[in-house]
Amino acid sequence: RPYLQTTYEASPLNRPVAQHGVGEAWVEHPVSYQYITRDPRSFSWLYYKIPSGNFLGVCTTDEDGNPAYEFKDGLGRTILAGRMDGSDPYFVYYQYNNHDDLVNVYPPFVTYPKMHEPEGPFDTQSSYSYRYDFLHRCVYKKLPERDAIYYIYDHGDHQVFSQDGEQRVRGEWAFSLSDELNRPVLTGICHNSYYYDDFPLCEIDVKARRDDTGTAFHGYIPENIPMTNPVVYTAVSYTHLRA
C-alpha cells in the first residue's frame, strides 16, 4: 500500500484517531490517538499550583503499542507530557506565569515545591527556569546543572548583552551591537556593571556607527552606551553599492 491513511473521528472536531503508515507491514500497527479529560487533583504524584478544572489530553500509542500522554489546559498550554512505566510516572511538568510565559520546566523525578509549602532548597539544579521582562523577552535562563544566563535588551528590541556564570565571576558581559540598519556588526566582551532585572537599556537605542576613527572598535563607534575595557571578537563591514 503506497500511501498514508488517516482515520478521523465521527464528530465536528474531525480529530484523527488512527494513522497507518506506508506499506502492508503497518496495516495492523497504526499510530492511534485517544482523547481524554482528567482532573489535575487526580495526579497524586504531581500537585503544585495546578489550575482547577480538567486537562484536555491525548494519548498517542505508537506502532509498538507504547502510549504517551500530553495534557493541555483550557488555554492550549501544555502542562504535562510523558509516559507511564507501570505505576511509575515519567512526566515533564510545565509551569506558566500570569502572562502565559513559560517559567519552569520540571523533568521527571525532579523535586519541586508542592502546594502550601514554602519555597525551599528544591532541586532547581535539575530543572529549567525562565524569567521575562515587561515585553515577554527572556532575561533569565537557567538550564539543568548550569548557572543562569542573563540577557539585556535595548529599546529597539536588540539583545545587547548576555552573561553566563563564568563571565559573572570575571565581571564580564558579552555584547553584540548592530548598525543603523539592524545588521550585526560587533561582538565581544566588556566589563560594564549591570543587573539584568533593572532593565538598564529599556529606554536606550544602542547602535554601532561606522567611523574609521573608531580604532578600538575596528571602524565603529558605539552610540548611546559606554564600554568598559572592551575586547572586540568580531567586526563586520558591509559594502555600499551605488546604482
What are these regions (language model features)?
Residues 1-242:
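Beta-strand elements of repeat-based all-beta scaffolds
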